[in-house]
Amino acid sequence: MKTHYFKKIFNLKFLVIFFSILFCILLILDLTFERRIKGIKKRTDEIIKKIKDDNHLVEEIVFYETNSTIFEKSFYRVEILVKNKNNLTTKEKWYAVVDSIFFHEIHSLIKGRENIQIKDPKTDFHLSELILSLVPIVSSTIFMFYIISNIKKSSGKLNSNAKVSAKQKSLFTFKDVAGNTEEKEEMTELIDFLKQPQKYETIGAAIPKGVLLEGPPGTGKTLLAKALAGEASVPFYAVSGSEFVEMYVGVGASRVRTLFKEAKLNAPCVLFIDEIDVLGGKRGGNSSGGNQEKDQTLNQLLTEMDGFTQAKGIIVIGATNRADMLDAALLRPGRFDRKILVNLPDIKSRAEILKLHAQNKKLSSDIDFHQLAQQTPGMSGAQLAAVLNEASILTVRNHKDFITMTELSEALDRVLMGPAKKSIKYDPEERRMVAYHEAGHAVIGIKLKHAQKVQKITIIPRGNAGGYNLMMPEKETFFSSRKRMLAQIQSFLGGRVAEELVFDDISSGAFDDFRQATKIARLMVTKYGMSDLGVSQDSEFSDKKLIDTAIKKIIDNCYARTKHLMLENKTLLDQIAHLLLEQETITQAEIEQLVVNTKK
């Protein structure tokens, strides 16, 4: 109780107030003393003058010795009692703080004058002097106590800064994880390891010590780890790799030890390390201080997972989107025994994710999650959740009671391209050029066999784009072919070709299209072996000129084929552009109707 009260007194707020008051007292006393010192010469001259003056009778002079802690010098406070010759009943008392020179001067001045009584110097006790002498001692003591206590606290925080929640259980289960069917099957087996470890130990089976979840951001790696802990009803520890990185040497390794020590006390448990590539990156030959600290932290993690002191009953789950950056010692069996690739969701999983995130939302009866899933290939679970959240916000903004496909479509555009910039007003000729540019992309998507198909076209500016085509593949594939990649290049070039054919001019709006087309062509040449250079991959010794020539050849051939296809479908190009100028946005159904009308 006393210790707690003592700590409560010496908190930061109290110390600030205490030192502020102490400083004010010290300042007042110091100023008072200085004011008295500044008046010494004036008062000394005045006193000497009045002692010499015949109009005054000096009766008594008393000296008090004062040892100043400020000036480290002896002073005297002199008190003089005098009478006025003209009025003997009137007495005056003068005083001053003087130095030893004045003390001797007074003695020589009044020497032999019997009517003046001089008393020997007395010690002058002043409370202010006592306070002034005690202030440095008391202040230093309190300050040192505060510094030491803070160092202890800081040391504790540095050693264990991880977000530990050992006393809490994860509230998530695999029911809260939509999609990721194969990943959940792999994780389900770990539940039995955590619940009944002795069943495996009796037959000599080693329980997996670590599971590495690798995949793009937003695919649900953290959620899978939480669901595992929730299903097994065991404590869940969650830390980030960056929490082990500090400027102080040895702190990272100390935090790893502290974390595993805490986890061992609550085993069986799940220890989740997000962005483990920060902590477990490859060790190099650089011996700088930062790398040494990083290597020490990694070495401690390796030791804790499978070293002299093995962590029993603890399943370590690491999550990263850069598994290629991890150290080989961390990936070997005995540490991360299992590696699970968490891919972006397919169309079925996307529909399930959308339904899961829509459970607490008011939806219109016309919502088609399968159609929405078709329009979102390549999107992660986090992005799909963002689409539904944006749709909810738009519904409130539009003063509606239910989320409709209109809000969902707009929310999808906002997540992919950003909010619409309807305040931007195009010049009529610019607007017409944008319409034909987007129509050019659409024509290639409609008429080219292996190209992605158009879902929606708009000339409403979003982000840095003057307009855009929402184009999706007819079916999802796990790899790309040469024909698909060439068709994709032609789709990017369609806008530029349309501008050239209609206006005999080109705009800077195709800048990003060229960048994307060139990127695909470069991959075909340098990585996939889909050019005349053969199947060899690019290296530092490759002839850059030959590579650039091969890339240019692919782009030129695609441009020529795109131009030929655009000339064959000039009527469809005009109809799409005119409808865009009228409506600004065209849906997939309207595009299909235009194609049917053009064929008649």
Swiss-Prot record:
GO cellular component entries: plasma membrane
SMART domains from the UniProt entry: AAA
Active-site feature positions: E438
EC number: 3.4.24.-
Entry keyword Cytoplasm: no
One GO molecular-function entry: zinc ion binding
Keyword hit for Cell membrane: yes
Transmembrane segments: 9-29, 131-151
UniProt keyword terms in alphabetical order: ATP-binding, Cell membrane, Hydrolase, Membrane, Metal-binding, Metalloprotease, Nucleotide-binding, Protease, Transmembrane, Transmembrane helix, Zinc
All ranges on the Cytoplasmic side of the membrane: 1-8, 152-600
Membrane topology according to the record: Multi-pass membrane protein
Positions annotated to bind ATP: G215, P216, P217, G218, T219, G220, K221, T222
Family assignment from sequence similarity: In the central section; belongs to the AAA ATPase family.
Designated name of the protein: ATP-dependent zinc metalloprotease FtsH 1
